[in-house]
Amino acid sequence: MKVIVAGAGTLGRRVARYVGEKHDVTIVEKSRERCASVTEEFQSCGNVRVLRGDIDEPAILLEAGADRADVFVAATGHDEDNLVGCLLAKNEFKVKKVIGAVRNPRNRWLYNRSWGVDVALDSAQICAHLIEEEATLTDLVRLL
């Protein structure tokens, strides 16, 4: 499986580390410094490649292998970049599964199929659901 991870922050690196154990991963990162540190971090992992560039540029996505990618994960620190990357991955390169990481919960509503997003990762929403489930479970235990 070919996976492109946009953004080499904490989430992007974790995804690349986990998926890179068994699959071909390309990390696309805009920052020169972060590219250097991530390249060093992943030098022993033969399945992970680091490419410096901006995911808003189709030529960079093509160089990353978006035309043959199975999964695209937009995990930059900026919703605008994530959404444009998702849109390009889905519409220009026909990537099968596009995942976008929501940075600002107010922008959650944008992460949908019209922007090319198949799955929206919203950590605030995930935490809220977990808290609600815990509260519900605690209430149920008290009733018993």
Show where each model-derived region lies:
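Cytosolic regulatory regions of ion transport systems
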Residues: 1-144
